[in-house]
Amino acid sequence: MYVELVDETGQVPSEIIEQTKEVLAFAAKKLDLKESTEMSVTFVDNARSHELNLQYRETDRPTDVISLEYKPDESEFFFDEDMELPEELLEEMDPFIGELFISIDKAAEQAADYGHSIEREYGWLAVHGFLHINGYDHYMPEEESEMFALQEEILTAYGLTR
C-alpha cells in the first residue's frame, strides 16, 4: 500500500512518519487490501484539527483523528448512466481509499493521559482512522467491540503494545 504522508507542523519525527507508513501497510495486509491501494495521512496541529472537524463533522473543537473515506464515483469514468460497474473495477481504476488528519497536539495529550508511549498513540490513531476509512465504526456496542478488537490485534501484532 502506498501512503502519502504530509507533516504540516514540521514537528513529527522521521521515526513516527516511518512507523505510520509501516503500521498502515501492516493493517492493509491484515484486511487483505490490494498492494495498489493508496491513502494519505496529514499531521496537523489542534488549530487545523479544529478547523477540519468543524468543516467535515460540524463539531466545534479539535479532535485526535479525522478520517475521510473516498469512494470512487463511476460517473467520473463513464458517460453511460445505465451502466453499473463492479466495485472491484472501480477500485482498480481509482485505488485511493481516503485520508487521515492526525493532530500531533492531541496525540501528545492522549499519550500522557493514557500512560503509554507517543509511538503507541500515533499508531493507535493511524490504525483507528484507517479502520474507519475501511468501513469499521463504533457507534453501536457490537460495532465498537469488533473495531476495537481488530485495532488492538493489529497494534499488538505490529509490536505497539500498551
Swiss-Prot record:
Q: Which organism is it from?
A: Lactococcus lactis subsp. cremoris (strain SK11)
For this protein, what is any one GO molecular function term?
A: zinc ion binding
State its location(s): Cytoplasm
> Which residues does Zn(2+) bind?
H128, H132, H138
**HAMAP family on file:** Endoribonucl_YbeY
Q: What is the lineage of its organism?
A: Bacteria, Bacillati, Bacillota, Bacilli, Lactobacillales
Cofactor(s) needed for function: Zn(2+)
One Gene Ontology cellular component term attached to this UniProt record is: cytoplasm
Q: What does this protein do?
A: Single strand-specific metallo-endoribonuclease involved in late-stage 70S ribosome quality control and in maturation of the 3' terminus of the 16S rRNA.
Q: Please name the Pfam families in this protein's record.
A: YbeY (PF02130)
The family this protein is said to belong to: Belongs to the endoribonuclease YbeY family.
One Gene Ontology BP term is:
rRNA processing
Q: What does the record note about the cofactor?
A: Binds 1 zinc ion.
Q: What is the protein named?
A: Endoribonuclease YbeY
- Keyword set for this entry? Cytoplasm, Endonuclease, Hydrolase, Metal-binding, Nuclease, Ribosome biogenesis, rRNA processing, Zinc
Q: Which PROSITE patterns match?
A: UPF0054
> EC number(s)?
3.1.-.-
The answer to keyword Nuclease applying to this record is yes
